[in-house]
């Protein structure tokens, strides 16, 4: 069944893109933002599309549609695919407390996680049938803090950040845990990089770490590295093709930095600020200086 929702276009809002004075060129990005407000924004700061519901995670699909994990209201949340015209062409409704992640898969399935008394990771078909179900070994006392941005990785396994457990685990499809790493604070993202390392944002720990296959931290950045304090609840992250990392400050107030891009040498080269009351929970950087981010987004 096709469901139509209202979509707003070109909503003006103040933003600032800041580059350090010693950088040779200005950096611009267009991006998808998910959180209390859900929208696409171009590199000039113009909102080109929006969705009238709060979301946790989302992707711009090759066909131009948006795949979104919708925050719960009085239900268990949902996953929707919505066109730029606001037509919902796919919906999978959650059956427990909430749905906290979504990922489109190459085989056409959609990955999602359900939080609740039976925390689980699912692959569902476009017909809404469950093709894969993986039980997640997580605490049950706080459903909201069970998991966040789970991802299927190249070897067919699943990386799952488990917030309150302070651990990132790699599960096989049969539920067996084949790798894990303890984290210094609640992990939000677990991004398996091409070199085999894993990039992890540690939310209220206000830090980002990169660990190798043995769990050793090989790179770390936090508020301790800057005279200003850009970290303010490090939720979503994305590793760009140039090696830089974009990080969200989910709890940032209006007028404060909501997103920032940091180099391997811990230099901030781009920031995004707006006057919205809603924070950015996660995001997808779509281009840099007008050049589309090619390949699989590392987010």
Which ranges hold each PLM region?
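Histidine-/acidic-rich catalytic cores in large beta-rich domains
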Residues: 22-299
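Bacterial N-terminal signal peptides
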Residues: 5-17
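N-terminal secretory signal peptides that target proteins for export/translocation
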Residues: 1-2
């Amino acid at each position: 069944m096709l469901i139509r929702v209202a979509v707003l276009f070109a909503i003006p809002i103040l933003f600032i893109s800041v580059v350090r004075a010693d950088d040779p060129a200005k950096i611009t990005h267009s991006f998808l933002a998910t959180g209390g407000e859900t929208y696409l924004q171009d590199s000039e700061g113009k909102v080109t599309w929006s969705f009238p519901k709060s979301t946790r995670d989302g992707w711009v699909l090759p066909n131009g549609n948006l795949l979104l994990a919708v925050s719960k209201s009085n239900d268990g949340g949902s996953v929707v695919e919505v066109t730029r015209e606001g037509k919902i062409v796919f919906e999978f409704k959650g059956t427990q407390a909430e749905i906290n992640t979504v990922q489109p898969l190459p085989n056409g399935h959609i990955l999602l996680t359900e939080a609740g008394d039976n925390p689980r990771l699912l692959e569902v078909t476009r017909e809404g049938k469950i093709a894969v179900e993986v039980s997640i070994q997580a605490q049950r006392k706080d459903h909201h803090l069970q998991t966040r941005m789970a991802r299927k990785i190249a070897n067919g396994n699943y990386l799952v950040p488990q917030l309150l457990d302070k651990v990132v685990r790699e599960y096989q499809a049969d539920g067996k845990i084949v790798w894990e790493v303890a984290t210094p604070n609640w992990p939000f993202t677990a991004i398996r990089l091409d070199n085999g390392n894993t990039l992890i944002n540690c939310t209220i720990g206000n830090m980002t770490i990169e660990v190798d296959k043995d769990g050793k931290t090989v790179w770390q950045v936090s508020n301790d590295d800057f005279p200003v304090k850009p970290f303010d609840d490090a939720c979503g992250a994305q590793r760009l093709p140039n090696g830089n990392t974009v990080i969200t400050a989910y709890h940032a107030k209006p007028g404060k930095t909501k997103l920032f891009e940091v180099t391997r040498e811990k230099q901030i080269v781009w920031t995004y600020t707006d006057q919205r009351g809603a924070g950015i929970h996660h995001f997808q950087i779509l281009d840099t200086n007008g050049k589309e981010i090619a390949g699989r987004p590392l987010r």
